[in-house]
A protein has these predicted regions:
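Short acidic, Pro/Gly- and aromatic-enriched capping/linker segments at domain boundaries
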Residues: 1-17
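Short, surface-exposed, charged amphipathic helix/loop patches that serve as local interaction elements
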Residues: 20-185
Length: 185
């Protein structure tokens, strides 16, 4: 019998970022805490553009940037969607995306995507950190269930990223935990 996944704020893990003399206590978030994390991400960054929205914006950008050649270029996009693991198609798509960045409809979607991805570690750390210890760290505090922004801002950037990504990874059940409960009947 396998153990149930742990998503309790009481199950704190100690984490030491590579090369750091400091230790951070990170808690896997409960269901409600994960919903609050997702809501905060949406408030801060807007919704994460879906793959379909990104591809639609890319198509629109291609039509705008290269109207005379759009039909040929759009075949590459269609082929990539049919074979997303094809390395040649990935390279062609990357070239199209680079050109599309000059078109606002695509550039705005990419900016939303980048902001969202860039904020994941910050917001995850804000929600999941439960303490820290080590040199040159101020006393730990939480206000209204979160680490205050000014306090989080004093962490070295590399450590903040490592802590945040670790916190984010603790929000996702691993493959062993994902299928360890019986489906509802």
């Amino acid at each position: 019998m396998s153990a149930a996944p742990v998503f309790s704020r009481r199950a704190v893990e100690s984490f030491v970022p590579e090369g750091s003399p400091r230790t951070y206590q990170i808690a896997p978030l409960t269901y409600l805490e994960r919903q609050n994390y997702r809501a905060d991400m949406t408030r801060r960054c807007g919704p994460l553009p879906s793959q379909a929205a990104m591809m639609s914006a890319l198509r629109a950008a291609i039509r705008e940037a290269s109207p005379g050649n759009a039909a040929t270029l759009l075949v590459t996009v269609d082929d990539f969607e049919a074979e997303p693991e094809n390395d040649d198609l990935k390279a062609h798509l990357a070239a199209l995306e680079a050109v599309a960045m000059g078109v606002p409809v695509y550039a705005e979607q990419r900016a939303l995507q980048e902001r969202h991805l860039g904020m994941i570690p910050w917001v995850a750390a804000q929600h999941a950190l439960r303490g820290w210890e080590g040199e040159r760290l101020p006393p730990f505090a939480r206000e209204r269930g979160l680490v205050p922004e000014d306090l989080l801002g004093v962490l070295p950037e590399g450590e903040l990223l490592a802590v945040g990504w670790k916190a984010f990874s603790l929000m996702q059940p691993d493959q062993a935990a994902a299928g360890n409960s019986e489906p509802p009947s």
